[in-house]
Amino acid sequence: MSYDCDILIKNGAIVDGTGSAPYKGAVAVKDERIVAVGKVEGDLTKGADTVIDAEGMAVTPGFIDVHNHGDMTILYYPQADGYLRQGITTFVGGNCGSSPAPFEDEVSLGMGLYDLYYDLSPDMYYPTTLVDRDAFNEKHREMFGWEVNWRTMGDFMKEVEGRGLSPNYVPLLGHHPIRHVVMSHDFKRHATPEEVEEMKVHVRRAMEDGCRGMSVGRDYEPSYWASFDELVALASVVSEYGGVYTCHSLRTGLRKARRPGEFPPVKVEGLKEALNVGREAKISVEISHLGTLFDVTPMGDKDLAEAATKATLKLVDDAIADGVPVGFDLIPNVRGFGTSSNNWLISRLLPWLKVAGSREQLGRALRMKEFREEIKEVIWSGKYYSLNPNITPTWAQGTRIMESKEPAFVDKTIAQIAEERGIDPLDALMDVIVADPDAKTGSMGRQSPTKYMFYQHPSSMIGVDTYAIDTSYVTKNPAWSRPSENSFGGFAAYFRDVVREGKILSLEDAVKKVTSTSAAKFGLKDRGVLKAGAYADIVVMDLETVAPRATPLNPCLYPEGIEHVFVNGGHVVKDSEHTGARPGKVLRRE
């Protein structure tokens, strides 16, 4: 049979996204859609302007990232180079309770605009991101040349479409802006029944505008302060539209000051809460970046770790048995802090870095004994969440020096340096910074020895938990943070670690998780599969070479092995380079 097509991808191993075994064949594309997929090429080349010989490569549906914050930066990085060049053709934005709307006279657009917020309202410990719209826009005009004028999710979607984007964007509504727009700064309490009713109006409007669900971030303000009844009430509105309730469950507790003697919540209770929202609201649930939620002591005991993971997954399975559609997502590489890598060691002392104004100046100041003692007093008080030995007593064991002008420190943890010198770990940290304020570190990682059990669960999916950016992104006030490695190579790490090297999943099962399983979860029709009539979101990948090139020292490197990427039939990545094409769409609720 002859097919009129624009693009022909031939001789590849077709991995169609359904879980079926790969086979050698071809894919033909006309305009936005796939017109043929088959074992025999035949006359598919008729009219094809682009012919790709995929001999020795896998041809898969485009990858769908189900846990992402790309909506907060897509207007600033519309090509989303970091996503497309690792094969992400569709991202689900609006996670962890944050979305770009609704807002009225105050706006909050997340930590992707950290420099702007810091200029407007300098902070020492915790940034203020809910600010007056006029003041925000004055600074925004100065930095970017345009203003933020949208107020609703519908308006924001139109803004994104008007500017164009390379990937597809699946919008979720965040719980944070709903609470902000109704309660403003008076959010550290349960909402009144009248306030909940007002929130429901905003939820309904967002769902009518095309959102595919609502997210909450229970470890962050203002979601942290919501009652269970509020969550159920809002999720019930989302359920009316067939939407998804995505939940960063309560695990750490509020990520702000934690005084000595104040204990974090029992992590598993946060998962139970999310699943119970699903039961009460009769809604599909997505658990964000799930991990083992039972603490194991001593660490490293494989049998105990497996038992804890089984107990965590049993809660998921029990909810599924009760009729709740439950999925969960995993971050491929868990080094760093979600959206950022913070590989300058000095970032551990960020409040004092801000005061000093530069890494060099803080390095000099740390030579003062009195200054050190003041810093240690604050740290031990629990005022600074990100370095709090009261809640993370093993922090020094997990911080390894990877680069320093002082060779004696390289490839040692802060704990090892402290032991060698017979000093407190905090003093060891400061000694390393004094020796080289530009010293680089890499987290030892939090990769669970039982993560394979999560990958093998049929409800698991993948999300890189990062912003849509390119290699130019860095904070400037002062420079202390860089993007996460996952911003550039998370999916490449997934296929290397889970398929080629780890052999945890077969290629077809690994592909299914990030394509048809993810599409089904969020109701993406004709996405996530290679079949006639489906949208032409396609990745051509060399499974023998696919791997991240990003490292803790240099996270801003694109991966190897992702050769070609198509979005809605547009050739966005060609020979591993972004073409500049912007064929992406906002995938509204249908």
PLM segments and residue spans:
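Active-site neighborhoods of metal-dependent hydrolases
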Residues: 156-160, 165-185, 190-193, 199-221, ...
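Divalent-metal coordination cores built from histidine and acidic residues
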Residues: 57, 76-212, 242-243, 324
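Metallo-beta-lactamase
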Residues: 62-71
